């Protein structure tokens, strides 16, 4: 076994690509390392094409092995299970830029498996996984129009940072991943602290420039280790059939795409396609129906694109920079802590916000370490939202990805734990969909958070942009429909405030998207975003002063850290009794901070009173109402505070001489006692005599 290795410096890390030793039965395999973070990438493609398939079956599986971090999995079975949210997100991140680099018409099944086998907690595996995937596909015998370069870009103190580590990202105002070929950007995924458009665009350009070193290294590896590519050519197009279909359907498609309503338009398109197919079958019973369907789809795309390029109104009659009609409502559900209904054209999101305690926060144990997520955003896309039937169950990859994008858009404006000590869960239910439901979720989330009284820094809105480009002519579209997303050349989602961008996601299907085009798209998106924010402000322009009556109110108090054990009690008995008897949730921190949560104000007051009792210090000279707990020959022990007993000596029970303690006191009897002394060992000396009011002195005789 003779390994072929290429190494290069990338930012502050050394990247190594190695092939020829591991997984030699795959079409290609690369062991890719960035520092101590190492991934094994394998690529396998089926030689035989499934003739009946009308799509490209590419599967990307990204898996993190706990042994990579020197851990044993939790749970009963002690092995890795279903993919985590992070694994799903990284699989999507890898899939998006490589998919358009396979040739049109290629329908052989391809599977890419990325396995994290070693991890440095300071180096995230996502970028090296993408680099390794690009290298494996490039040296494989599969048709692939790569290589693909990848870069992570940070922004600190006004400077871009190439491939920042985890600690540097924590201080950065930007976390941007950009992927592209030598001449074109294909994919951008980012989260930002409300940065201006020019800074975001500069980050994309900077990342694309820096990633050329990756492309050059992969080209060198391919020259040395690359396999001969498959002898694959795209199937020849039947020009006669193309012309027949054009004659049968072009005019009808042009008319159908002037229907504004989505369902009417869809029905019209289906009807005209069925009519065209019937006519072709009548002429030739052996016509390839799959080919006909594909050509009708190509014609449909051409008709819509040519109308947009020629300056005709869009599918629903709008101009390129117009946003669909907006309908915005906050506080639409009576018992939720916060809610909103955001409608933009035929896209609608019902969004709810739920407040919880720190105990409700999501605790994540990943190979990068353990962390707590206080803000959660979940996105659901039920089949009825597009007028279809389908399976309902656990979230799919797309739902997880859209939820994370919306989370990135909002996270920058969320308050800190010190400002707002609640865990927050937002759920976006997409009740209607015709384009850009993830950005509707951003808008709805901003509204629901404010309705719940969450003190977010400012409102956030999102917009999806599209692009149609033919030669040197192009049109940038604001607020794209589902059909425009499918038929266009770019999907460009931007979320942000009036001051800047908080999240940017871009997927480009063609080469030739210049910096100028992206700049125009960002400026057009800014105008649309401000328009949406103005409409949102009419529903609610700032967070409510108080949280919902149905939400748990968190009251914070400080106790002596040495008293924490008293509040917890033996085996947790005291705090368990407190929570059960008052109906509150109580959380203790090591510094003595106590958080009491309850929707019932009286319950909170009772919990505070009892905690103050438990943690109170015994004060000399203070009179307490106590309870006799034990009687001995020389006196009685009396509880004056929870967990605090003192001794009333027999001589301190009454003014007269006491011969038998039991003649004066019984266990369970309540008595007033005065603290006379607390010695160095914490023992408390009490007196019943001194707790009694003194008789007034008799007046002097005249």
From Swiss-Prot:
Ranges for domain KH: 552-611
Give EC number(s), comma-separated: 2.7.7.8
Q: What is the originating organism of this protein?
A: Shewanella woodyi (strain ATCC 51908 / MS32)
Q: Does the keyword Cell inner membrane apply?
A: no
**Primary gene name:** pnp
Q: Which family does it belong to?
A: Belongs to the polyribonucleotide nucleotidyltransferase family.
Disulfide bridge positions per record: none
Self-association state and partner proteins as the record states: Component of the RNA degradosome, which is a multiprotein complex involved in RNA processing and mRNA degradation.
Task: Give the protein's function.
Answer: Involved in mRNA degradation. Catalyzes the phosphorolysis of single-stranded polyribonucleotides processively in the 3'- to 5'-direction.
Report the leader peptide range: none
Q: Which NCBIfam families match?
A: polynuc_phos, PRK11824.1
Which residue numbers delimit the S1 motif domain?
621-689
Q: What is this protein called?
A: Polyribonucleotide nucleotidyltransferase
């Amino acid at each position: 076994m003779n390994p072929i290795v290429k190494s290069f410096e990338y930012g502050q890390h050394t990247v190594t690509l190695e092939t020829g030793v591991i997984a030699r039965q795959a079409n290609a395999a690369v062991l890719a390392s960035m520092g101590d973070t190492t991934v094994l990438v394998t690529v396998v493609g089926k030689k035989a094409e499934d003739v009946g398939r009308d799509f490209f079956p590419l599967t990307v599986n990204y898996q993190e092995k706990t042994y990579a971090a020197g851990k044993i999995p939790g749970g009963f079975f002690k092995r890795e299970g279903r993919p985590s949210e992070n694994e799903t997100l990284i699989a999507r991140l890898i899939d998006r830029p490589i998919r358009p680099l396979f040739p049109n018409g290629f329908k052989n099944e391809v599977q890419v498996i990325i396995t994290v086998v070693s991890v440095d907690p300071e180096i995230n595996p996502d970028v090296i996984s993408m680099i390794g995937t690009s290298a494996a596909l490039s040296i494989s015998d599969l048709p692939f129009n790569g290589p693909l370069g990848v870069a992570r870009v940070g922004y600190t103190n006004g400077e871009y940072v190439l491939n920042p580590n985890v600690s540097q990202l924590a201080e950065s105002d930007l976390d941007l991943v950009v992927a592209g070929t030598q001449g074109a950007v294909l994919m951008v995924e980012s989260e930002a602290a409300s940065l201006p458009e020019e800074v975001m665009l500069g980050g994309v350009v900077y990342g694309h420039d820096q990633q050329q070193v990756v492309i050059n290294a992969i080209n060198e590896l391919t020259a040395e280790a690359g396999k001969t590519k498959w002898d694959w050519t795209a199937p020849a197009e039947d020009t006669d059939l193309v012309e027949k279909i054009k004659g049968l359907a072009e005019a009808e498609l042009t008319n159908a795409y002037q229907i504004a309503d989505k369902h009417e338009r869809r029905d019209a398109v289906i009807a005209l396609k069925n009519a065209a197919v019937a006519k072709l079958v009548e002429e030739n019973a052996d016509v390839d129906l799959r080919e006909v369907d594909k050509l009708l789809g190509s014609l449909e795309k051409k008709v819509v694109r040519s109308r947009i390029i020629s300056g005709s109104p869009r599918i629903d009659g709008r101009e390129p920079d117009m946003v669909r009609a907006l309908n915005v409502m906050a506080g639409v559900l009576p018992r939720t802590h916060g809610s909103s209904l955001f409608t933009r054209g035929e896209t609608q999101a019902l969004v709810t916000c739920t407040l919880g305690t720190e105990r409700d926060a999501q605790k994540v144990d990943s190979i990068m370490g353990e962390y707590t997520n206080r803000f959660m955003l979940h996105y659901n896309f039920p089949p009825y939202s597009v007028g279809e039937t389908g399976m309902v169950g656990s979230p799919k990859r797309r739902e997880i990805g859209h939820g994370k994008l919306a989370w990135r858009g909002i996270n920058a404006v969320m308050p800190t734990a010190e400002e707002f000590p609640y865990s927050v869960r937002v759920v976006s239910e997409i009740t209607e969909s015709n384009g850009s439901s993830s950005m509707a979720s951003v808008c709805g989330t901003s509204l629901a958070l404010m309705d719940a009284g969450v003190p977010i820094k400012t409102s956030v809105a999102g917009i999806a942009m599209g692009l149609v480009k033919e030669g040197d002519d192009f049109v940038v579209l604001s607020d794209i429909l589902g059909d425009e997303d499918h038929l266009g050349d770019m999907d460009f989602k931007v979320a942000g405030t009036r001051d800047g961008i908080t999240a940017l996601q871009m997927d480009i299907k063609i080469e030739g998207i210049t910096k100028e085009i992206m700049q125009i798209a960002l400026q057009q998106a800014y105008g649309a975003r401000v328009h949406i924010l103005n409409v949102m402000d009419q529903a609610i322009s700032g967070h409510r002063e108080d949280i919902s009556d149905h939400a748990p109110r968190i009251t914070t108090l400080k106790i002596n850290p040495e008293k924490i054990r008293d509040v917890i009690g033996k085996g947790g008995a005291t705090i368990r009794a407190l929570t059960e008897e008052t109906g509150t949730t109580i959380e203790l921190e090591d510094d003595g901070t106590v958080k009491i949560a309850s929707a019932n104000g009286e319950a909170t007051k009772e919990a505070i009173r009892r905690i103050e009792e438990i943690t109170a210090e015994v004060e000399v000279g203070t009179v307490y109402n106590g309870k006799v707990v034990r009687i001995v020959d020389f006196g009685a022990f009396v509880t004056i505070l929870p967990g605090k007993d003192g001794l009333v000596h027999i001589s301190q029970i009454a003014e007269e001489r006491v011969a038998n303690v039991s003649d004066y006191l019984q266990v369970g009897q309540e008595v007033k006692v005065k603290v006379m002394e607390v010695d160095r060992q914490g023992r408390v000396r009490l007196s019943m005599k001194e707790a009694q009011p003194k008789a007034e002195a008799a007046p002097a005789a005249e």
